[in-house]
């Protein structure tokens, strides 16, 4: 995510919860401010940087992508794999069961590997029986890419940090959780203080997650006059601000 709330995919912006930048513990006001500022910056960047016509190379890439989609859609309609409705329900249930508030690392790892294996030949292993199911088939693929990225991040955090935030990591060797009568309900890995000053980055397909140190807050001279002057400079010469990170 750069200063314009543009993701690593050029032209794709994310703000608010979708950006995943709020952190584990944050005041509600800062989350709201981040959402509002991010949306504003993204809108400005879209307006100021979209004045150029697409290059010949970009048009060729779009046409090639359209042809790939046509062929992949034909494969879905001819496929004899798992039907899209069954596929979606199966993965949704597994995520809720193993990767919700209670997290099972072994089952999450198995689910991650299953999703990665399916993505390697998604169109050959998925079937859309009617044209109406084609949109869901494409959404399922996006769901699996997202699912694998989320599981990568959760597994990395579980291994390094234990139970943290709203996620309890279950383990037979963990600390017992008891009800009001002292009866043991389950055992969970205690929270570790490691990586409190780090953020978790997930990138790539297949996804890889890693911790990186957070950046210190910059010391800025953010008076109204200076902020307004910078805004006007962005409007006058947007190309200077297109690739700011």
Regions found by a protein language model. Name each.
Residues 1-14, 18-245:
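Glycine- and aromatic-enriched mobile tails/lids
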């Amino acid at each position: 995510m750069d200063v314009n709330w543009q993701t690593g995919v050029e032209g794709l912006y994310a703000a608010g919860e979708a950006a995943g930048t709020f952190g584990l513990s944050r005041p509600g006001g800062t989350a709201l401010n981040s959402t509002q500022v991010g949306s504003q910056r993204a809108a400005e960047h879209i307006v100021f940087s979209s004045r150029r016509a697409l290059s010949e190379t970009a048009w060729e890439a779009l046409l090639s992508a359209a042809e790939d989609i046509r062929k992949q859609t034909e494969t879905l309609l001819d496929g004899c794999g798992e039907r899209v409705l069954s596929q979606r329900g199966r993965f949704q249930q597994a995520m809720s069961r193993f990767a919700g508030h209670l997290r099972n690392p072994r089952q999450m790892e198995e689910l991650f590997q299953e999703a990665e294996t399916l993505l390697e030949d998604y169109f050959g292993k998925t079937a859309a029986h009617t044209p109406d199911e084609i949109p869901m088939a494409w959404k399922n693929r996006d769901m699996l890419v997202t699912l694998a990225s989320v599981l990568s991040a959760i597994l990395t955090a579980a291994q390094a940090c234990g139970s943290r935030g709203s996620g309890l990591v279950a383990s037979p060797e963990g600390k017992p959780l008891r009800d009001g009568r002292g009866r043991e309900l389950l055992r969970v890995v205690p929270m570790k203080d490691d990586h409190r000053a780090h953020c978790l980055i997930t990138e790539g397909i297949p996804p890889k997650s890693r911790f990186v140190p957070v950046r210190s807050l910059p010391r800025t001279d953010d008076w109204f006059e200076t902020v307004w002057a910078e805004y006007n400079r962005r409007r006058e010469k947007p190309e200077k601000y297109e690739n700011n990170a």
